[in-house]
């Protein structure tokens, strides 16, 4: 029996629950969406690239016939996108039973977000925290709602350098990644 089949047996019914998963167009995020959809959850795929998101939505519908699923655009490296996506979710969904913060960025060359933050800290920490905060009123009004945050064992190697959060005094792609995972 495969790992995901074992996990499927352990997941309780999610019938009637709305679950948003960031970065769910591929990898762990997509498999999480698939397993939860098989248990009856309504899935919101949130990802940056809408073409890849549409493909993930089609794949999910093919693998889980009858699934209630939708796609929203979310670029965690752009706080305006974060605000727009949260507003769209709040406007279109009366409840949100779970937010799974899965999206993240790992070890790119030094880059900045649209808001001029170091890319990994801006995406993995600031974008995710802003998104969660903006959705908190909807989560709070949903009985039993949960927020799940994926991280990495790389956090063990991280330190929070408050004097260099924006990588202006030097940059190590792994150091910045580990710092962002520790901050999660």
What are these regions (language model features)?
Residues 2-184:
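Rossmann-fold NAD(P)H-dependent dehydrogenase/reductase core
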């Amino acid at each position: 029996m495969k790992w995901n089949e074992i996990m499927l047996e352990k997941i309780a019914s999610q019938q009637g629950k709305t679950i948003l998963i960031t970065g769910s167009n591929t990898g762990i995020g997509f498999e999480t969406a698939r397993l939860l959809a098989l248990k009856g959850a309504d899935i919101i795929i949130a990802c940056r690239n809408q073409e890849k998101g549409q493909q993930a939505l089609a794949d999910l519908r093919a693998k889980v016939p009858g699934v209630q699923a939708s796609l929203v655009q979310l670029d965690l490296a752009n706080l305006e996108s974060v605000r727009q996506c949260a507003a769209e979710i709040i406007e279109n969904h009366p409840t949100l039973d779970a937010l799974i913060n899965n999206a993240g960025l790992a070890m790119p060359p030094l880059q900045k977000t649209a808001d001029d933050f170091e890319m990994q800290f801006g995406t993995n920490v600031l974008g995710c925290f802003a998104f969660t905060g903006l959705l908190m009123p909807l989560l709070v009004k949903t009985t039993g709602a949960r927020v799940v945050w994926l991280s990495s064992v790389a956090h063990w190697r991280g330190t929070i350098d408050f004097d260099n959060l924006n990588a202006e005094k030097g940059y190590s792609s792994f150091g910045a990644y580990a710092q962002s995972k520790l901050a999660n």
